[in-house]
Amino acid sequence: MKRTLLPFYAVALLALGSTAAFAQVDVTVTGSTAFRSVTIDRAWSIFDVSNRSAQTNSASTGLITFSGTMSNAAPSLGGTVVKLRLSFSGSARGMEDVRNSTLINVAALPGEAAPGVSNTTRIPDLALSDVFPSSATPPIPESAFNRSVLGVIPFVYVKNNALTGVTNLTQSQANLLMIASGTGGMPSSFLGGNNSNPIYMTGRDAESGTRISVEKCIGFVGSPLLWTTNGAGNFVVTNGLTSGGLERDIIKAKADAIGYLGVADANAIAASASLVPFNGIPFSHTNVVIGQYSIWGYEHLVNKVGLSATKVTVRDALKAAITAPFFQASNTLYNVAFTAVAEMHVERGSDGGTITSLDF
């Protein structure tokens, strides 16, 4: 049998090529828009300061790809180049895309797309979600994912400041508001307001964890009647808005608007809108921690079983950066809008589920 011997330099080149094929880790994160700012900040923080770059195709939606090394946050990766791609689509949609290996748009790094094209596609590896997998439509079995809890995310009802007299929502009122607002519908006086003009309920689309969480927490079942505005600024029926930013803009602009938001979005329009207590309890982190305020859920991180070891390393570095007690307690990106897991004295086992004590 004739054997062909390769020169030493050829063997070396082949070995180098084999190493290069595994010389980078490419991880794509999708899901919750409510947790977007925290994820962007923490993702950037786990890269080595001296070796990191960002391709930002949309700062407002978080369509960003980071690239660099993570030798401090993930020592086992050493000098391996890591590409961490962020593309937020909503909690339920994000989990579905991870489970179904659906291609999503991500920001392309130089050389990854045709000239003049700014985005490329990837199958997402991780999804952030404001809700348990079982709350997706259709429900996703717990066995489909590795899942961990990153934080506690409260939601609040917010009204335009012109809706004077609306100082509380009971559970029954919140449910009625979901189906009876708008033209010819519920007047603000029904909620304690000072006039007979109709009140307009705005909200998120069906893929939104914010919507799912709020509906579960108030016990609403069915299809809500939601409103947005058209180009002329007039109210029109909608299936729901794709982001909290769009919803808060409606509440800010329209004197007869009310809706539900994450705390960060509510704070962004504090000059024009105010929080509405639920069942007589105003939102505060303390009221969440002790179980008095009930409109809240968990922020989850999920991935399909079988994620590669190097991607698990990146996942764990991101998770550690987000759940670090010092970060959750002291960083305003987190502690203004979210409640620290370590501070909770209560828990719940499902979205909108019974709140039980962790202390006794």
Predicted regions and their residues:
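Bacterial N-terminal signal peptides that target proteins for export
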Residues: 1-9
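Sec/Tat signal peptide C-region and signal peptidase I cleavage site
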Residues: 16-23
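Flexible loop/hinge segments at secondary-structure junctions
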Residues: 23-360
